[in-house]
């Protein structure tokens, strides 16, 4: 299996620092956390069960449907776009290598071991990476971080003392938007408009002028 790791590193030619950390560090087993620079951590992602994350195929289809133009652009859009690009490239190289190893292994047991290792270990890490960066681009990084914390608190709370359903990421932005609207309301809306002031009757204007003189 060490030879498999070595082949992965040699074949995964990624030019950026994020990809180097992913291929040379994280998948190799070094103590490098690819989420730290985004305010999260591997431990925080580990609170989400493995069946929470969609398949790699679904995540790749989602990223292509939503961000194909930005991902294919030569320009730097955001750190999340860069990390997403390299995760997709690394997964493609990994699949190419796994296919090559599977075709050249004569022993069926060894072939199944390689396929199972890729799907259960590296596949889960890639699914976590893809989900995290797609979610940050879709809902915002702060919303995703709040969701991870909320889910972590929920899952660690004993069942008798927590809500029956886990938090849902898609509902958090709605709450955030409502709060921002309440905080962002301008006090000018409460004051009467200039039209209403002009439409006041002369009698009312006289009474107001008398009060101002007092």
Swiss-Prot record:
Ranges for region 3 X 8 AA repeats of S-P-R-R-R-R-S-Q: 186-208
Any one GO CC term of the record: extracellular region
Region (HBEAG): 25-27
Pfam families found in the cross-reference section: Hep_core_N (PF08290), Hepatitis_core (PF00906)
Keyword terms: Disulfide bond, Host nucleus, Host-virus interaction, Repeat, Secreted, Signal, Viral immunoevasion
Region annotation (Disordered) ranges: 164-214
Swiss-Prot/TrEMBL Sequence repeat ranges: 186-192, 193-200, 201-208
Chain residues in the propeptide: 186-214
Protein location: Secreted; Host nucleus
Bias (Basic residues) ranges: 178-207
Signal peptide: 1-19
GO molecular function: DNA binding; RNA binding; structural molecule activity
SUPFAM superfamilies for the chain: Hepatitis B viral capsid (hbcag)
GO biological process entries: microtubule-dependent intracellular transport of viral material towards nucleus; symbiont entry into host cell; viral penetration into host nucleus
PTM section of the record: Phosphorylated. Cleaved by host furin.
Site annotation Cleavage: residues: 185-186
Subunit structure, as described in the record: Homodimerizes.
Family named by the database record: Belongs to the orthohepadnavirus precore antigen family.
General function of this protein: May regulate immune response to the intracellular capsid in acting as a T-cell tolerogen, by having an immunoregulatory effect which prevents destruction of infected cells by cytotoxic T-cells. This immune regulation may predispose to chronicity during perinatal infections and prevent severe liver injury during adult infections.
Protein's name according to its UniProt entry: External core antigen
Gene name linked to the record: C
């Amino acid at each position: 299996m060490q030879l498999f790791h070595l082949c992965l590193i040699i074949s995964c030619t990624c030019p950026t620092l994020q990809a180097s950390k992913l291929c040379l560090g994280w998948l190799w087993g070094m103590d490098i956390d690819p989420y730290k620079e985004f305010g999260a951590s591997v431990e925080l992602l580990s609170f989400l069960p493995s069946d929470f994350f969609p398949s790699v195929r679904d995540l790749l289809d989602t990223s292509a449907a939503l961000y194909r133009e930005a991902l294919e652009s030569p320009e730097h859009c955001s750190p999340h776009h860069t990390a997403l690009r390299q995760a997709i490239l690394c997964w493609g190289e990994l699949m190419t290598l796994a296919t090559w190893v599977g075709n050249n292994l004569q022993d069926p047991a060894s072939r199944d071991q390689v396929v199972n290792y890729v799907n259960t270990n590296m596949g889960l890490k890639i699914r976590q990476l893809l989900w995290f960066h797609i979610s940050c681009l879709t809902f915002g990084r702060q919303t995703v971080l709040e969701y991870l914390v909320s889910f972590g608190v929920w899952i660690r709370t004993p069942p008798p003392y927590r809500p029956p359903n886990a938090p849902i990421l898609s509902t958090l932005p709605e709450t955030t938007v409502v709060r921002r609207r309440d905080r962002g309301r301008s006090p000018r809306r409460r004051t009467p408009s200039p039209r209403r002031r002009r439409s006041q009757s002369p009698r009312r204007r006289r009474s107001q002028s008398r009060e101002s003189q007092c």
